[in-house]
C-alpha cells in the first residue's frame, strides 16, 4: 500500500484497480488527483502487481475486500473526506465492500466501467469444465483472454503493458469462478448506496465489460444521489484513453461538490 499526500489536502481518494493490473499503471491518475489537492491511497490487490501472493490466484473474493478495507482504514487516518474510485473489477470489489458495511463513512463514490458482466465470451467447454476444476485444481491457471489493446486506444499504454512483467495474463480457475459468483451477487438489489453520492462512468465502446449489465445495475440501485455518464467511443479504461483529461475533469467536478 502506498500513500501520496497533497500539499494542502481537501480530500483523500482510495483507488481500487482492476484485474491483471497494479498500482504502477495509475501514475498519471495518481498525480492528477494529488496535484488537485487530494491525497491518494492505493495498493496492489492479492495476486497482482508486487503483492507476494500467487499471481492471478485467490482462494476467495473476500481476500480482495479485506485488503481494500485496510486501504480505506489508512485513508481515514489522513483526516480528510474519503472518496472511493473503483475501476473494473475494482468497482465490483467496491460494491461488495459497501454491502458489508453498516457505517461506511465514505463521502462519495466513483465507479469506472465496473465489472458487472463480461463482454468477452468464454469458451463454453472451458466454462463448464471450470466448475469441476474449481474443486479439483483451483489454482490451475488459464489465459485470461484479455489483451492490452482491448482495454484502451492509448498506444503508449498498450506498448507499456505488452512489455510489463507485472501485467497478469493468466488467471486461476478459482479466480474465474469467484469473479462470476461475485458478479451475480452484485446484481442483487441493495440499499447499501442509499445515502452515498454515486457517479458511475462507463466506456461507450467497452470491449471487456458488458455495458448493458452496468446500465441494468445502475437502474436498479437504490440511491438518493446517483448519476451515470457514458463516454461515447471510449474503451474500458476511461482514465487511460486519449480523452482522459476530460474524463478526469468530470470525476474531479463530482468530488469537488463534497469537500
Where are these regions (language model features)?
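Active-site glycine-rich loops that stabilize anionic/oxyanionic intermediates
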Residues: 10, 18-21
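Catalytic nucleophile-loop/oxyanion-hole region of alpha/beta-hydrolase
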Residues: 20-22, 49-78
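Conserved alpha/beta-hydrolase
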Residues: 30-53
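Alpha/beta-hydrolase-fold enzymes
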Residues: 89-172
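Short beta-strand/loop motif that positions the catalytic acidic residue
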Residues: 194, 200-202, 206
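Acidic catalytic loop of the alpha/beta-hydrolase fold
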Residues: 205-209, 237
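Short alpha-helix in the alpha/beta-hydrolase fold that links the catalytic acid
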Residues: 210-219
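Catalytic active-site module of serine/aspartate enzymes centered on a nucleophile-bearing elbow/loop
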Residues: 224-259
Amino acid at each position: 500500500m502506498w500513500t501520496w499526500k497533497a500539499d494542502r489536502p481537501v480530500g483523500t481518494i482510495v483507488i481500487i484497480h482492476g484485474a491483471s493490473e497494479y498500482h504502477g499503471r495509475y501514475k498519471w491518475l495518481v498525480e492528477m488527483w494529488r496535484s488537485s489537492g487530494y491525497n491518494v491511497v492505493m495498493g496492489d490487490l492479492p495476486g497482482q502487481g508486487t503483492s507476494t501472493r500467487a499471481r492471478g490466484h485467490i482462494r476467495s473474493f473476500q481476500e480482495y475486500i479485506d485488503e481494500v478495507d485496510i486501504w480505506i482504514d489508512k485513508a481515514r487516518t489522513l483526516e480528510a473526506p474519503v472518496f472511493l474510485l473503483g475501476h473494473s473489477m475494482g468497482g465490483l470489489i467496491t460494491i461488495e465492500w459497501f454491502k458489508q458495511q453498516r457505517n461506511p463513512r465514505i463521502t462519495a463514490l466513483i465507479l469506472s466501467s465496473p465489472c458487472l458482466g463480461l463482454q468477452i465470451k468464454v469458451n463454453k467447454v472451458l466454462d463448464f469444465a471450470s466448475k469441476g476444476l474449481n474443486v479439483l485444481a483451483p489454482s490451475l491457471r488459464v489465459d485470461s483472454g484479455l489483451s492490452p489493446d482491448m482495454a484502451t486506444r492509448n498506444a503508449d499504454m498498450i506498448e507499456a503493458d505488452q512489455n510489463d512483467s507485472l501485467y497478469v495474463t493468466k488467471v486461476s480457475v478459482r479466480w474465474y469462478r469467484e469473479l462470476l459468483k461475485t458478479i451475480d451477487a452484485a446484481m442483487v438489489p441493495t440499499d447499501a448506496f442509499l445515502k452515498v453520492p454515486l457517479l458511475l462512468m462507463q466506456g461507450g465502446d467497452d470491449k471487456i465489460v458488458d455495458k448493458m449489465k452496468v446500465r441494468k445495475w445502475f437502474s436498479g440501485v437504490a440511491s438518493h444521489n446517483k448519476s451515470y455518464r457514458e463516454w461515447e467511443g471510449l474503451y474500458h479504461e476511461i482514465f487511460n484513453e486519449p480523452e482522459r483529461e476530460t474524463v478526469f475533469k468530470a470525476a474531479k467536478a463530482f468530488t469537488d461538490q463534497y469537500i
